[in-house]
Each structure stands twice: as structure tokens, then as C-alpha cells.
A protein has these predicted regions:
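Conserved catalytic cores of soluble enzyme domains
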Residues: 49-56, 60-77, 81-208
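Hydrophobic/aromatic residues within transmembrane alpha-helices
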Residues: 23, 36, 88-89, 145-146, ...
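Short, active-site-adjacent cap segments at secondary-structure transitions
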Residues: 28-32, 82, 306
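Hydrophobic alpha-helical membrane-association signature
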Residues: 1-5, 55, 278
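Charged catalytic carboxylate motif
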Residues: 4, 58, 254, 258
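A structural preference for short, pocket-lining loop segments at secondary-structure junctions
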Residues: 3-46, 65-76, 98-101
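C-terminal alpha-helix plus adjacent terminal tail
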Residues: 141-144, 159-347
Length: 347
């Protein structure tokens, strides 16, 4: 599917009469729930890491292609958007959330890291360190939260999507541009509500905690803030912080430490540089035990009891984390063509 989509996008980008691209999921359940990580891990378990890495090579090249397309791309995030689904939506010009949207980057709980350009879009689209919070905890955003968090450019009720498609198609081969597509989307927008329980109501607290330089520092800040918020009036914030602590406790210690460094480095890199960095990381994760163990525990045996190795944050050294970011042998680095176009958003 990745190769087919990449081929189609490349052809449309080169076709003068194609003035816009709309991406949507098949059916109402999901936009894209991510790649088949069970199949990838099965390849890695046989020792064929090169074949497993090839999946990620093609996926990241697709992400880069979306990032440099000048043809306006509208991704309709109607339903589940996880992992790879973020990679084929976040790098385009427009991202439309609906009341049925559910977005997450749950990779740390799988023993991986938020890839597909997550090191680029999480620090840029989200306010402050909210992207770090999402990447480390895998927290799920729903509906209008995607727009409020900066991950969606527009919020349009699902009932209005058929009319939106007609409007976009009606722009014709010469009437579509970034500005006219944006105007069309705005014509269907509605203002939603952020639920009272949303962590978006506690950005200052999350920014303070997830701005720490280490994962241990994040945990310490969360605990200290929880203890300081003892009043009934602060119950909502305390629940958000406690949920974050629980999520961190479930993640792979290696994944958590690599992810924190990855997102910090990604703030200063282009999309292409981020994807090349992530390709180095995924090569190492395919050879390390935690990715396969996370897939076993959460997706295969489904016992929910991954045995991480190392099993604690204290056992994951700075040197071991840095090794994940080291250059690959000659000829194995991710090759990408061209530079990403400048988006109308913060990308």
C-alpha cells in the first residue's frame, strides 16, 4: 500500500491538471490505524532486519514526499489516526478533524518511538511541550482536541464531509490553490468543545513537567506537582498528571529515553533530517529486544505484561541512548529527494 500511495502521489504532483489531493480512510472506522508492525517484527525475528527496515525506508520516503508536495493535500482524519496514519496526514497542508477523530502516537508502549516524522511535527504543531507529552504517554486526543492541540488545521463535522468533497471537486483543474482550498475548508468549519477532562486545560502544568531534561526529571516534576495540587479545585489537573505517570510507567524505558532525546533534537531539524534520524533509530530498535516484546505483549499474546530489557530507567545509560542515534554504515542511510515545502502552518 505504501508503494502504491507513493507512486500515485508522485504522479499527481507531476500532473498539471491535478490541483489538489484528498486523502481519506476506507469506511467510517479509521483514517489509518498504522502499519502492520506484527509483520515487520516477524521479519526481524527471523534475522532479516534488512527486509524489516525496508518497510520503514519506504514509509519514511512517503512521509518526505508528502512534506515536499506543492499540490495541496487534504487529509480527512475521520476515525482512528495512529502511528503511520499520522505520517500520511501531518506533513500535508491541511488536516481535517471530525467529532469521530481519535489520534495517538502509542509507540513507547510498544517498545518503539514516535516515528513517521513525529520528531518534526510533535514539537512544532503542538504548543510548548505538549507534543512531548503525547509522544511519551501515547495519550489519545479526540474530536476538537486535535484542532485545539494544533494537529488539525480545521474541524468539520462528519455529516458535512460529502458536501465538502463536492465543494473541493468543484474547484476544478484551474481553480484550486492553497488559498482556495483553505477558503473552502473554512466554509464548512464549526467550533467544537474541548472536554473538561482534556489535558489541554492544563498546558502550563504539562509544559513545566515535560520540559524536564530527563525522563526521570519528568516523573519527578509530575509527582511534585501532584503533591502540590491537593485541593479539590485542582482535582482535574491532578488526574491528568497521575494518568501521565501511569502511562510513563508502562512504556519501555529505552523507548522513553530515546523519545525524549529524539523530540528535543527534532525541534532543530528539517523534516528530511528528522526522518533520516528516525531511520537510524528504527534500525537499532529492530535489533533490540523491546520492540518485539512490546508487539508480543500488546498485539500478539495480549497479556499486557511486556518484560522490558533493560527494565528500569536507571539501567538505560546516556551512552546506550546516544548509540541509537549514531550514523549507519555507508550505503544504509535513508536517501531522500528534495526539500520539504513551506507549510501554511507551523511545519
Amino acid at each position: 500500500m505504501i508503494a502504491g500511495l507513493a507512486d500515485a502521489l508522485a504522479r499527481w504532483e507531476a500532473a498539471p491538471l491535478v490541483q489538489g489531493v484528498l486523502l481519506k480512510g476506507a469506511g467510517e472506522k479509521a483514517f489509518c490505524a498504522g502499519g502492520d508492525v506484527k509483520a515487520v517484527v516477524a521479519q526481524a525475528r527471523t534475522g532479516d532486519v534488512a527486509a524489516a527496515a525496508e518497510f520503514f525506508r519506504q514509509e519514511y520516503q512517503l512521509n518526505a514526499l508528502l512534506g515536499r508536495m506543492r499540490t495541496p493535500v487534504v487529509a480527512v482524519l475521520d476515525g482512528i489516526v495512529m502511528g503511520g496514519g499520522c505520517g500520511i496526514s501531518m506533513h500535508g497542508a491541511f488536516r481535517v478533524a471530525t467529532e469521530r477523530s481519535l489520534l495517538a502516537m502509542p509507540e513507547c508502549a510498544l517498545g518503539l518511538f514516535p516515528d513517521v516524522g513525529g520528531s518534526h511535527f510533535l514539537p512544532r504543531l503542538c504548543p510548548g511541550h505538549f507534543g512531548t507529552f503525547l509522544g511519551l504517554t501515547g495519550h489519545r486526543l479526540k474530536g476538537f482536541e486535535l484542532k485545539a492541540a494544533g494537529l488539525a488545521t480545521h474541524f468539520i463535522p462528519s455529516s458535512r464531509l460529502p458536501a465538502l468533497e463536492e465543494r473541493l471537486a468543484g474547484l476544478g483543474p484551474t481553480g484550486a490553490s492553497v488559498d482556495t482550498v483553505d477558503a473552502a475548508l473554512q466554509g464548512f468549519e464549526e467550533v467544537g468543545e474541548v472536554p473538561a477532562s482534556s489535558p489541554l486545560h492544563h498546558l502550563a502544568a504539562l509544559d513545566e513537567c515535560f520540559g524536564a531534561a530527563t525522563v526521570e526529571g519528568v516523573q519527578d516534576a509530575l509527582r511534585a506537582r501532584c503533591e502540590a495540587q491537593a485541593s479539590a479545585a485542582a482535582a482535574g489537573e491532578r488526574e491528568v498528571l497521575q494518568a501521565a505517570l501511569k502511562a510513563l510507567a508502562k512504556g519501555s524505558p529505552t523507548s522513553l529515553k530515546v523519545t525524549l532525546q529524539q523530540l528535543a533534537m527534532g525541534r532543530l531539524k528539517s523534516l528530511e533530517e528528522c526522518l533520516q534520524m528516525e531511520f537510524r533509530l528504527v534500525h537499532r530498535f529492530l535489533r533490540a529486544p523491546d520492540f518485539a516484546e512490546g508487539v508480543r505483549a500488546l498485539l500478539e499474546d495480549k497479556d499486557g505484561e511486556p518484560q522490558w530489557n533493560p527494565g528500569s530507567l536507571s539501567a538505560v545509560t546516556k551512552a546506550s541512548v546516544d548509540a541509537y542515534f549514531a550514523p549507519l554504515p555507508e550505503g544504509e542511510e535513508l536517501a531522500l529527494g528534495g526539500k520539504a515545502r513551506r507549510s501554511r502552518g507551523k511545519l
